Amino acid sequence: MSGQLEVSAPSRSILNDKWDVVLSNLVVKTGLGFGAGVFASVLFFKRRAFPVWLGVGFGLGRGYAEGDAIFRSHAGLRAVRA
């Protein structure tokens, strides 16, 4: 035996890590949706506003869904496999 104790992470640390991942996912997904909406608006819809709002809505919804999955998981942070 090496005599070293294994210290588990406190639940507060795990919760903070989860919030960091959820908020960063939400910002990234919303930004990607905004960008895709602007791109679609310029190319296909004669610069109307609805594709931008639709893209932002999809981004927020996807970020919320992933955040919900992260908080519902029992094993800490979820690993995404491609």
UniProtKB/Swiss-Prot annotation:
Record-annotated membrane-spanning stretches: 21-43
Residue numbers on the Mitochondrial intermembrane membrane side: 44-82
InterPro entries xref list: Mic10
Recorded topology in the membrane: Single-pass membrane protein
GO CC terms in record: MICOS complex; mitochondrion
Biological process per Gene Ontology, one example term: cristae formation
Keyword list, A-Z: Membrane, Mitochondrion, Mitochondrion inner membrane, Transmembrane, Transmembrane helix
Coarse class of the protein's main subcellular location: mitochondrion
Compartments, record wording: Mitochondrion inner membrane
Function: Component of the MICOS complex, a large protein complex of the mitochondrial inner membrane that plays crucial roles in the maintenance of crista junctions, inner membrane architecture, and formation of contact sites to the outer membrane.
Family of this protein: Belongs to the MICOS complex subunit Mic10 family.
Assembly information from the UniProt record: Component of the mitochondrial contact site and cristae organizing system (MICOS) complex.
Protein name according to UniProt: MICOS complex subunit MIC10
Organism of derivation: Eremothecium gossypii (strain ATCC 10895 / CBS 109.51 / FGSC 9923 / NRRL Y-1056) (Yeast)
